Amino acid sequence: MEPEVRNNPQESRYELIVESEVVGVAEYRREGDTLVFPHTQIKSSFRGQGMGARLVQAALDDVRAGGGRVVPRCWYVAEFIDANPSYRDLLAA
């Protein structure tokens, strides 16, 4: 089954779902149109499979679609943006 990423605004996080199980989260705090990402986590049995990148990419794509900006406090989100320059325009000034 293909992993799915969904925004769960009640929990202030994006969730990576595999076979109905939450296997990863990218937590955020909303500050107006900006989302601050302080923490990202992938279940240990799913690490090393590109799941973190899928989660962060989908979260950033969703922020872009909504016209928002991001502050990457989480090292993984910061490194993802650094490695993928097409997302640098999302960085809040």
Predicted regions and their residues:
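Conserved N-terminal entry element of GNAT/NAT acetyltransferase domains
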Residues: 1-7
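Structural motif
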Residues: 8-10, 31
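Conserved beta-hairpin
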Residues: 13-23
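General beta-strand recognition
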Residues: 15, 34-36
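Conserved beta-strand in the GNAT
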Residues: 21-29, 36
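A short, internal acetyl-CoA/4′-phosphopantetheine-binding micro-motif in the GNAT/acyltransferase core
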Residues: 40-47
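Conserved acetyl-CoA-binding loop-helix of GNAT-fold acetyltransferases
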Residues: 48-59
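C-terminal structural segments of small proteins and small subunits
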Residues: 61-93
